[in-house]
Amino acid sequence: MATVTVGTARVHYDIEGAGAGPALLLVHGTGAGGAVLTWGQVGPRFAGDRRVITLDLSGADRTVDDGGPLSVEMLAAQVIAVIEDAGTGPVDLLGFSMGAPVSAAVAALRPDLVERLVLVAGWAYTDGDEYMRNLFTLWQRLGGSDPEGFGRSVTMTGFSRGFLNGIGREGVEALVPNLPPTPGTLRHVALDLAVDIRALLPRITARTLVVGGTQDITVPVENSRELHAAIAGSAYAEIDAGHVMFFEKEDEFVKTVTGFLGS
């Protein structure tokens, strides 16, 4: 584990693998669990022939800062600092959910640091999308008054109906406590409500793959299609799964990403 200081934040990150190719940096989504909770299962599958970097953004468990409001640009600065501190050269950059707009901002602001870009279940803006605005507002309300309700809402929207029915009641009940509404998670939710990277998207020059989940009811797939349309020359793929598609369809997700990164 390594750390780098960015403003008031001491950002924790890990490097796994020893491959000679471009490193792959994975940027997590909303949640205080950060890198461990998001990438613990699928991350090692990318480490066979490359180095894989995971980090905890402000609001996640291992990174400590002043607890103030977050912005896309602030978190992008943390990703940039990790790339530079790790000394791996330009990286392939993959962002999931909240991590997708953050990763897109990194690619737009520092094109010299990004070889290829993968945006998974991401979106360009929240204000104007009444579905997502209301969902994130609901999470804020539940986070302040009903932690179990928060966990159930996140579980219900994070996975497809078929997946939830497939794992059954015991499996679903085990998922509910996995994303508690900690202060850090609620800082992420506040950021989710404020996302607007539309002005940055035309500046992205890295080869880009956008991946949407056809059954995503956290960030509906239309948002991924809009990202693809806004990034010149980007490739696009859909996986028939809910928001956390790498949990529901791990093999297909890994094949989709490695197929793009190896091309």
Regions found by a protein language model. Give the residues of each.
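Short beta-strand/loop motif that positions the catalytic acidic residue
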Residues: 204, 210-212, 216
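Conserved HGGG/HGGXW glycine-rich cap/lid loop of the alpha/beta-hydrolase fold
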Residues: 6-64
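Conserved alpha/beta-hydrolase catalytic His-Asp/Glu region
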Residues: 128-130, 148-200
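Conserved alpha/beta-hydrolase "acid-adjacent" motif
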Residues: 217-223
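Active-site loop/oxyanion-hole signature of alpha/beta-hydrolase fold enzymes
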Residues: 44, 53-94
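Gly/Ala-rich beta-loop-alpha elbow adjacent to hydrolase catalytic centers
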Residues: 95, 99, 103
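Catalytic histidine-centered segment of alpha/beta-hydrolase-like enzymes
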Residues: 241-254
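Flexible "cap/lid" loop of the alpha/beta hydrolase fold
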Residues: 104, 108, 115-144, 184
